[in-house]
């Protein structure tokens, strides 16, 4: 080659690699065993010695048309290329051969280029010490390998790069440890590594560990990172803390033929375009295999992750990012020789065109899968586990955030092992769950989303004689049967020996709604669990035994002809049976439980009345049919009411019936007590509003009267209804307030009074049924407003005739609360009015003239017409006030004396004790109807009353009065009342 041509080639290479300002001549000066190279040269720099320390400074430039750029041979070698240094060679840029026993150390900060070989090539003898190659910056490029080391010594190989490393036709970094070597370590802290074959290839035939750490981009047309441990090597560690690893076939390929563990840690993107993003194979001699993805995305043209452990060690895969298997599974894991498999998805998404996750355990180890992210399968399943060994156990835990589905419709498939699948709070499964030949358990736990479930199959073995037990635990709301094709909202429940609905720890939302028949050997409804019959079906059969400690509900739809048949035995463990019924007489209808086997234990019965009016029964309405030994007991869990009647659950022969009791409900008494109180609470008589005085207006001298009176009443009432079975007691309080607004006289002797009054009252009652022991409570609160008028024939002496009249408008809020029944609320209002007349005459006086004696016959007519609104109870009973007005007549005689003590002379003080007897007659008893059946208060038509009291004037302005009255009637009717009144005159 001519000198001109050589200059052109050099200039072209320098331009290509950015080296145009190289010095004119390279000179390697020697000082002892140290060489310092500066400037430019076109010849290979061959340096040989025992111990060599070679420094290529920042001005050095070596460019050769043939051979190496720098060739160093010796026993202990240190080569340093400073930043700015350049080597461009036809063969290897730097060729190092350690023929002795010392270490080989390279520190590269410049540019090394090989046009037909390796950028840097290191070969050692079998006795050589460790290799350390550190690239702090710059570029290392080779037509074959960017860096190649062949270490045959007995120590370690350590390669650390921070710049660009490139292998045009082979590997970016190709590192080999011979059989006597130990650890092989490659660390990338920046830059970029690329290779035509592999980005990084590490092969350890020695006895130590192999570790590769990357923080930036690594790529190769076959594998981004390729690691191979031979028979005597120990652990493999590949750790990606950032960046990307990309391979035309594999992103990371690790093959451990050694005797240690294999660990793959990724945080960035890993891509295997035509194969697997991560491919790991542990040979039989190796131990544990672990893959941890802490972020990023792993993509494979086949599988996202493929891990095969032939050893006895355990296999674990943990993911936090996205994993994609474009023509295979997102993650495929298999073992060959008995180790456990643990797969954990902390978050993220895993998808594959075959399975999202595919796990094959060929021996006796356990398989555990924990999912907290999205898993999407293709043609096979979302999660597919298989066991080919003996006594294998598989556990799949779907936790908060889990979302499992597949294009095939099979969300989870687990075959050939004892499998436990847990759908926990926040987990969702769409599609089928298919469990294989094993003792399998599926737990649908509280808070899981089963809305997308279509099939849950406990066993793919149809042999009824095998010893396999499959258990389905439902702690969630689920609808389905054993005879549906399976769809979201109507799940096919297949091949389960034991079905448990609810448990002691999870009692909310544990509901199985049957859309058809259900096959199981044993169905247990735990406390808090519920089994319903869907509104879409009328007749449902349960094939096995049933134990009920929760609720068996046939009454979710408003019809009363559902039938639930239990082919086996039924045992009640204080559970509840809920049925619909049209509560009538014997012609009434009801849902029915049919037990073809035996019954045992105790069951409570709840009845939903669907518009039944209530009637007396003879035989009753059948609700439970028992064809075997009827040792179990059934009893109502609360009140069963319709119209005027209570119903009970009674046994006749082997079967159970609803039968009405021949006694009215106690609520009758509460309605009656409220009706009576509404018409009597504000009833007044003349002497409830005593006296007044006159005063002279200071300005006009006109005589006027004004006053304010108030009375307080407390009373207690007792009565019985027409059946004699309902005993009612009530307590009342009344406060009335009034006063005269006008007073006048026509002849100076008589006196007319006109006044206004208002009041508040409360009455609380309790009714007890002697027939069944039930109670009911009534409560009425209300107000009144009205006026009164009085005429005295003799105002001064209050003798002769008098007439008193009043009229009130009354309104009340009413409540009736039956035992174990909802509170009923209704309104009442109406008019009460009275007309009273009597005659007062003196019968005598004391010797001293201080005391006079009076007799007063009287009669009062009172019209009572406070009516309650028609009311429909929560159970459908129509309640009507059946008393259309009542005229009460009171005929009585009052005897009293009037006087004062000598010490009260001149003090305007007088006292009037009295005794009064009355006969009271009502034209109607208070009456109420329930669904057309009438009941009334008895003993109140004719009542005798005795009243004792005293009326007194304390001074000219203040009057007080009080009395106690006792009324007695037939059939235990009685009323006791105390009154205290006060009046102040202005």
Model-derived features: positions:
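Extracellular beta-strand/loop-rich repeat segments of large surface/secreted proteins
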Residues: 441-443, 450-456, 462-620
């Amino acid at each position: 080659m001519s000198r001109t041509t050589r200059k052109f080639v050099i200039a072209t290479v320098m331009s290509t690699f950015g080296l145009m300002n190289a010095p004119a001549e390279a000179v390697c000066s020697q000082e002892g065993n140290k060489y310092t190279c500066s400037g430019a040269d076109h010849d290979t720099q061959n340096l040989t010695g025992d111990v060599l320390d070679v420094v290529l400074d920042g001005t050095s430039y070596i460019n050769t048309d043939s051979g190496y750029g720098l060739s160093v041979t010796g026993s202990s070698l240190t080569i340093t290329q400073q930043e700015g240094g350049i080597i461009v060679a036809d063969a290897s840029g730097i060729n190092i051969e350690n023929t002795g026993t010392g270490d080989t150390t390279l520190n590269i900060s410049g540019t090394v280029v090989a046009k037909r070989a390796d950028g840097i090539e290191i070969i050692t003898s079998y006795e050589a010490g460790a290799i350390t190659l550190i690239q702090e910056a710059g570029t290392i490029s080779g037509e074959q390998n960017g860096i190649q080391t062949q270490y045959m010594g007995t120590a370690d190989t350590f390669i650390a790069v921070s710049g660009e490393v490139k292998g045009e036709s082979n590997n970016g970094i190709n590192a080999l440890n011979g059989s006597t070597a130990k650890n092989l370590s490659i660390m990338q802290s920046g830059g970029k590594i690329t290779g035509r074959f592999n980005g990084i290839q590490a092969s350890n035939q020695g006895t130590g560990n192999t570790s590769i750490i990357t923080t930036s981009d690594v790529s190769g047309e076959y594998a981004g990172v390729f690691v191979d441990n031979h028979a005597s090597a120990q652990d493999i560690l590949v750790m990606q803390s950032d960046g990307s690893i990309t391979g035309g076939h594999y992103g990371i390929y690790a093959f451990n033929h050694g005797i240690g563990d294999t660990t793959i840690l990724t945080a960035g993107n890993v891509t295997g375009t035509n194969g697997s993003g991560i491919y790991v194979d542990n040979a039989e001699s190796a131990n544990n295999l672990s893959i941890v993805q802490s972020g990023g995305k792993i993509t494979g043209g086949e599988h996202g992750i493929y891990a095969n452990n032939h050893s006895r060690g355990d296999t674990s895969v943990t993911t936090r990012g996205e994993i994609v298997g474009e023509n295979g599974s997102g993650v495929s894991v298999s073992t060959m020789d008995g180790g456990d498999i643990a797969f954990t998805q902390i978050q993220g998404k895993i998808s594959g065109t075959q399975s999202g996750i595919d796990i094959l355990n060929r021996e006796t180890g356990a398989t555990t899968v924990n999912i907290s992210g999205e898993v999407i399968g293709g043609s096979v399943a979302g999660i597919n586990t298989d066991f080919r060994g003996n006594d294998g156990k598989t556990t799949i835990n779907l936790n908060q955030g889990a979302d499992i589905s597949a294009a095939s419709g099979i969300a989870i498939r687990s075959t050939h092992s004892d499998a436990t699948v847990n759908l926990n709070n926040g987990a969702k499964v769409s599609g089928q769950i298919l469990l294989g030949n094993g003792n399998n358990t599926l737990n649908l736990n509280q808070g899981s989303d089963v809305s997308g479930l279509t099939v849950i199959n406990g066993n793919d073995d149809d042999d009824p004689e095998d010893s396999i037990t499959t258990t389905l635990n439902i702690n969630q709301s689920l609808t389905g049967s054993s005879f549906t094709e399976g769809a979201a909202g109507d799940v096919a429940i297949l091949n389960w020996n034991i079905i448990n609905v609810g448990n002691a720890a999870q009692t909310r939302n544990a509901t199985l709604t049957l859309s058809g028949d259900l096959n199981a050997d044993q169905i247990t409804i735990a406390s808090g669990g519920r089994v319903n019959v869907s509104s879409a079906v009328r007749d449902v059969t349960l094939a096995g035994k049933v134990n009920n400690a929760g609720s068996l509900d046939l009454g979710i739809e408003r019809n009363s002809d559902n039938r639930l048949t239990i082919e086996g035995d039924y045992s009640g463990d204080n559970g509840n049976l809920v049925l619909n019924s049209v509560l009538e007489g014997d012609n009434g209808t009801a849902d029915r439980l049919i037990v073809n086997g035996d019954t045992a234990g105790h069951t409570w019965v709840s009845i939903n009345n669907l518009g039944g009016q209530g009637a007396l029964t003879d035989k009753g309405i059948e609700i439970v049919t028992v064809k075997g030994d009827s040792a179990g007991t059934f009893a109502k869990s609360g009140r069963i009411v319709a119209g005027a009647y209570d119903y009970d659950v009674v046994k006749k022969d082997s079967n159970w019936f609803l039968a009405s009791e021949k006694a009215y409900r106690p609520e009758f008494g509460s309605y009656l007590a409220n009706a009576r109180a509404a018409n009597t609470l504000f009833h007044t008589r003349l002497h409830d509003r005593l006296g007044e005085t006159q005063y002279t207006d200071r300005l006009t001298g006109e005589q006027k009267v004004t006053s304010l009176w108030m009375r307080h009443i407390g009373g207690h009432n007792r009565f019985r209804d027409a059946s004699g079975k309902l005993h009612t007691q009530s307590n009342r309080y009344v406060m009335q307030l009034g006063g005269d607004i006008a007073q006048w006289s026509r002849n100076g002797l008589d006196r007319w009074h006109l006044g206004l009054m208002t009041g508040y009252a409360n009455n609380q009652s309790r009714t007890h049924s002697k027939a069944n022991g039930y109670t009911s409570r009534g409560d009425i609160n209300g107000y009144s407003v009205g006026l009164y008028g009085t005429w005295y024939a003799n105002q001064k002496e209050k003798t002769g005739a008098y007439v008193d009249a009043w009229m009130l408008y009354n309104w009340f809020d009413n409540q009736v609360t039956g035992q174990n029944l909802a509170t009923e609320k209704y309104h009442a209002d109406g008019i009460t009015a009275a007309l009273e007349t009597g005659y007062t005459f003196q019968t005598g006086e004391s010797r001293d003239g201080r005391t006079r004696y009076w007799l007063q016959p009287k009669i009062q007519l009172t019209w009572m017409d406070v009516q309650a609104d028609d009311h429909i109870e929560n159970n459908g009973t129509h309640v009507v006030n059946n008393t259309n007005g009542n005229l009460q007549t009171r005929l009585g005689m009052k005897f009293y004396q009037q006087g004062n003590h000598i010490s009260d002379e001149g003090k305007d003080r007088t006292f009037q004790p009295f005794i009064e007897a009355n006969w009271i007659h009502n034209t109607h008893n208070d009456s109420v109807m329930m669904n057309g059946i009438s009941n009334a208060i008895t003993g109140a038509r004719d009542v005798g009353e005795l009243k004792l009291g005293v009326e007194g004037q304390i001074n000219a302005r203040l009057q007080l009065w009080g009395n106690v009255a006792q009324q007695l009637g037939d059939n235990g009717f009685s009323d006791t009342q105390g009154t205290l009144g006060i009046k102040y005159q202005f």
